[in-house]
Amino acid sequence: MKCPYCSSAQGRCTTTSSGRSITECSSCGRVMEERQTQNHHLFHLRAQDTPLCLVTSDLQTAAQPSPEDEEDPFEPTGFITAFSTWSLEPSPIFARSSLSFSGHLAELERTLELASSTSNSNSSTVVVDNLRAYMQIIDVASILGLDCDISEHAFQLFRDCCSATCLRNRSVEALATACLVQAIREAQEPRTLQEISIAANVQQKEIGKYIKILGEALQLSQPINSNSISVHMPRFCTLLQLNKSAQELATHIGEVVINKCFCTRRNPISISAAAIYLACQLEDKRKTQAEICKITGLTEVTLRKVYKELLENWDDLLPSNYTPAVPPEKAFPTTTISTTRSTTPRAVDPPEPSFVEKDKPSAKPIETFDHTYQQPKGKEDKQPKFRQPWLFGTASVMNPAEMISEPAKPNAMDYEKQQLDKQQQQQLGDKETLPIYLRDHNPFPSNPSPSTGISTINWSFRPSVVPGSSSNLPVIHPPKLPPGYAEIRGSGSRNADNPHGDF
């Protein structure tokens, strides 16, 4: 038999105060095994053969007239015959049986008795609190796979804390979990606070609160290197199935970061995770951020931030005689983890939209012009912001007041209509420069009715010829009126009865 606490193979049999038989360890004195003995009252049936003697005379008697029966065993033959009786009688037997099982309950009883004897109060409340704390510590320790020495030390811390402070209105389970965290740190076991919180079903904030209470009650100090890189790194590398070279490189990077204070705002677990990811990049190990975060309990955002901080000093992180499997320029070019592009993109002006893109109808209206170029009425003296009025098909810059009513950018049909109006205006010319009798002249007359006797004369207007230019087309100038005569008004047509156009 082997002791589950100290692994000793020597034990001795003894009896508890309640009369139970146990086997305790000779080295540590803890209960290894408990035996339960039971007496059994049995009866054994034994066969008993009792002789019965019957004596008969040897003399022959007178012959009887009864018929002879040769098969009769009781027929006297004249000799002495011995008879016996056979029977089954129960005989009592005193037997004892023994049942052996684990000694956890007996160890719990021994621990509670020891706690009750050392405590100042022997009330039932203290016993119940000790029982709850012991069960909490044992359950969490079994889930995390901790040694029995750690759980025993945690329960001792709980008893000392109960003696030093009051547990009224406080959670016994949270205090027991805090005692287990302190025992784990003193034993330098690689267990994170997040793992303990999940196993104990207690929030990390609550555990931290009771760790502070425990430290104030027992005047405890933080153990040296209880949460260092060397504690967590081997466990993380083992769970990630990394080889020895990657593990040594990650440990070296983490220790350099801690010693040179490159990441002062980060805890050792975050630094360990980032160092593992950096070592995997240099050793060409295919480990994703999600895999590392699942093992270490971090988020991918935190991992990327710490990794970015490590890259700022990556020249000082690597050993002097180390040759990476992947060159650092390829392993981590000066970029972020999530993208291969530079973090500060070059400032390039957006290209101007082409004329064809302006004509393309868009399925979704663009409201850029409404918000960008919208100006209140009464401020028409200000120059509009856009520089390309020809894209809208107008001869001059549009009035900002007109742009307020425009819901969206003009499409291709509006542009063609504006171009047609522009051509007509160029052909008609500016009417303000014409004489009054030619302003109402229509250069594109409709078809005259053949039934009317009115003859129509078309006055075609031509711009003045530039001197020096040769042209074969005749130029018709409007007649000049002498001073003092009223201006002749007409529709551009003359009648034979009224040659001067008088009304």
Swiss-Prot record:
Its main location: plastid. GO terms for cellular component: chloroplast outer membrane; nucleus; plastid outer membrane. One of its GO terms (molecular function) is rDNA binding. Widely expressed. InterPro entries: Cyclin-like_dom (IPR013763), Cyclin-like_sf (IPR036915), TFIIB (IPR000812), TFIIB_cyclin (IPR013150). It is a peripheral membrane protein. Ubiquinated. Subsequent degradation by the proteasome pathway. Plant-specific TFIIB-related protein that may be involved in an intracellular signaling pathway between plastids and the nucleus. May act as general transcription factor (GTF) of RNA polymerase I-dependent transcription and rRNA synthesis. Forms a ternary complex with TBP2 and the rDNA promoter region. This is Plant-specific TFIIB-related protein 1. It comes from Arabidopsis thaliana (Mouse-ear cress).
